[in-house]
């Protein structure tokens, strides 16, 4: 390439997106061309290339009790009752049949708070 071409390329590399858009519109006006026509071919090439999968952020979480040590059962039952509104027998049955979902379809902050309360009581907990 000639030195003039290299200089132009280097100047184009240093331009901001706003400056580049302004340059394109000035070239269109000056030379009477339409820069959008070649973009259609580029779109078809881009469409043929495999796209990266879109990763969605999880918005609903489930708090699971995985294990409750025997020495901590009473404390965990109290926390489960407070969180779920279950009776004593239902809460006891729930922690005896671990792994078990305590709360489902809740927000991230609430799930983290519940996890912290259950872990402080002695349970092994995961948030899914």
From Swiss-Prot:
Superkingdom of origin organism: Eukaryota
Location in or out of the cell: Plastid, Chloroplast
GO cellular component term of the entry, any: cytosolic large ribosomal subunit
Keywords assigned by UniProt, alphabetized: Chloroplast, Plastid, Ribonucleoprotein, Ribosomal protein
GO BP terms in the entry: translation
Coiled-coil regions, chain positions: none
Pfam families: Ribosomal_L12 (PF00542), Ribosomal_L12_N (PF16320)
GO molecular function, one term: structural constituent of ribosome
Family: Belongs to the bacterial ribosomal protein bL12 family.
PANTHER family, alphabetized: 39S RIBOSOMAL PROTEIN L12 (PTHR45987), LARGE RIBOSOMAL SUBUNIT PROTEIN BL12M (PTHR45987:SF4)
Protein purpose: Forms part of the ribosomal stalk which helps the ribosome interact with GTP-bound translation factors. Is thus essential for accurate translation.
HAMAP family: Ribosomal_bL12
Quaternary structure note: Homodimer. Part of the ribosomal stalk of the 50S ribosomal subunit. Forms a multimeric L10(L12)X complex, where L10 forms an elongated spine to which 2 to 4 L12 dimers bind in a sequential fashion. Binds GTP-bound translation factors.
Name recorded for this polypeptide: Large ribosomal subunit protein bL12c
């Amino acid at each position: 390439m000639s030195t003039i071409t290299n200089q132009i390329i280097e100047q184009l590399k240093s331009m901001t997106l706003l400056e580049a858009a302004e340059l394109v519109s000035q070239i269109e006006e000056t030379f009477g061309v339409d820069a959008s026509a070649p973009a259609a071919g580029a779109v078809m090439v881009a469409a043929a290339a495999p796209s990266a999968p879109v990763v969605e952020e999880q918005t609903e979480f489930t708090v699971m009790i995985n294990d409750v040590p025997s020495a901590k059962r009473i404390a965990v039952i109290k926390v489960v009752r407070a969180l779920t509104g279950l009776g004593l027998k239902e809460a006891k049955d729930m922690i005896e049949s671990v792994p078990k979902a305590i709360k489902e379809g809740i927000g991230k902050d609430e799930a983290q708070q519940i996890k912290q309360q259950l872990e402080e009581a002695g349970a092994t907990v995961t948030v899914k």
